[in-house]
Amino acid sequence: MQRNHSNLYAPCGLYCGVCRIYQATLENDLAYLKRLGKLYARRFPQIAALSTEELQCDGCLSARLFPSCQVCAIRDCVQAKGIEGCHACADFPCEHIDEFPIPAGKKAILRAVPYWRENGTQAWIQSEMERYHCPTCEERLYRGVKQCPVCHSIVDLD
């Protein structure tokens, strides 16, 4: 399946290309999606009853979204304002960011949006793609990871 990479430009600044849910969908790794579903069900209990197919996501701006992303105040706000993302909004950071339900995501948003605003979309994407690698072994990592699964180095990428 050919992917539309513009679907990965989440308006909030969380580049979907480094999201483990997106990567598991891309790789058709249903076992990993099931594990992620159990993890996310701790914060979003309604996810527990969903099938792995219902957990798949093709990126924030696609038609197929992870359940907790289907209702997104940030995406709705950006679309209502007719702007590309929070980086183009004079009100950033706002109550939508303050109320973001996932602490690691909120931290990444607060880091990424100013960079996106200052450097533009392509530089922001490149920066996000480069950031999420293990500094010890160069293994590809994902947002929220605290330890490299290959060399077990502790990482603080967000």
Model-predicted regions and their roles:
Residues 3, 17, 136, 154-158:
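Phosphate/adenylate-binding glycine loop and adjacent helical scaffold
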Residues 7, 48, 54, 122-140:
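Ferredoxin-like iron-sulfur electron-transfer modules
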Residues 1-87, 91-118:
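Hydrophobic scaffolds flanking metal-cofactor catalytic centers in soluble metalloenzymes
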Residues 94, 123-127, 147:
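Broad hydrophobic/π-residue packing in well-ordered secondary structure
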Residues 57, 86, 134-137, 148-151:
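Short cysteine-rich clusters marking metal-coordination/redox-active sites
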Residues 77, 94, 152-158:
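Short Cys/His-rich micro-motifs in 6-15 aa windows
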